[in-house]
């Protein structure tokens, strides 16, 4: 995403860097909760109580998202103050305000995905957690950024013309938010399938008990 931002302005690059630093607070919170969630899921699957494992994930996700929505509300209400903590350049603050107003409300969805990823890891289904990260960046964020931010036109064989929207740097911010929301929807749907419930239990059941 940094390479895309660099095609606009120095102020946009600086604002993006500051915005990511502010976002790192949400990642820290979500990462810690995700680790705790992984432990809870592993323990409950190990004791053959998958429903309680699911409850751990949903409650942890809801609590994390509530905290991050509250934090985002403060940042959206006072975006200039949040950016001003790091820099006093008017152009950067202006770009940063745009970034925060668009991206900050999606912090909760980033956090929700990280907690659900913790649930998958606790169940021993680590590949799903990796796939969710891939989806967020390469399936949702980057393609949406190419369509929203840039002004290209492409004509397909047969005469069908495709055109990007050309929203500029704001298109990148919307793509960032879209990646969070899209990956969260997929994460929730995948987790609700329940295919993870046999992860730890099956692996333990297949291991022969030691004999004396």
Regions found by a protein language model. Name each.
Residues 2, 28, 75, 144-145, ...:
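Structural signal for membrane-spanning alpha-helices in multi-pass inner-membrane proteins
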Residues 15-77, 110-129:
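Small-residue-rich hydrophobic transmembrane alpha-helices
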Residues 31-34, 103-122, 128-137, 144, ...:
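Short runs within selected transmembrane alpha-helices of multi-pass transporters and secretion channels
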Residues 4-24, 91-97, 125:
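Interfacial/gating helices of multi-pass transporter permease domains
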Residues 1-7, 80-81, 121-133, 204-212:
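Alpha-helical membrane-embedding segments
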Residues 41-106, 152-212:
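Short alpha-helical transmembrane segments in multi-pass integral membrane proteins
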Residues 1, 5, 41, 82-83, ...:
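Hydrophobic alpha-helical interface/terminus motif in multipass membrane transporters
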Residues 114, 140-159:
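Transmembrane alpha-helical segments of integral membrane proteins
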């Amino acid at each position: 995403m940094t390479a895309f931002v660099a095609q606009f302005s120095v102020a946009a690059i600086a604002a993006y860097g500051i915005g990511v630093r502010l976002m790192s607070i949400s990642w820290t919170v979500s990462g810690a909760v995700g680790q705790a969630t992984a432990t809870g899921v592993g323990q409950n699957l190990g004791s053959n109580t998958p429903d309680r494992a699911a409850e751990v994930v949903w409650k942890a996700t809801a609590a994390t998202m509530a905290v991050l929505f509250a934090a985002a509300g403060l940042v959206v209400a006072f975006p200039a103050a949040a950016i001003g903590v790091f820099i006093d350049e008017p152009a950067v603050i202006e770009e940063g305000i745009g970034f925060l107003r668009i991206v900050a409300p999606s912090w909760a969805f980033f956090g929700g995905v990280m907690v659900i990823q913790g649930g998958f890891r606790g169940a021993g289904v680590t590949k799903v957690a990796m796939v969710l990260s891939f989806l967020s960046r390469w399936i949702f964020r980057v393609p949406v950024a190419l369509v929203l931010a840039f002004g290209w036109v492409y004509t397909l064989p047969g005469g069908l013309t495709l055109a990007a929207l050309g929203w500029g740097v704001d298109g990148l911010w919307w793509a960032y938010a879209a990646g969070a929301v899209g990956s969260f929807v997929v994460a929730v749907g995948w987790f609700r399938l329940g295919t993870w419930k046999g992860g730890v239990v099956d692996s333990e059941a297949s291991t022969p008990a030691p004999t004396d």
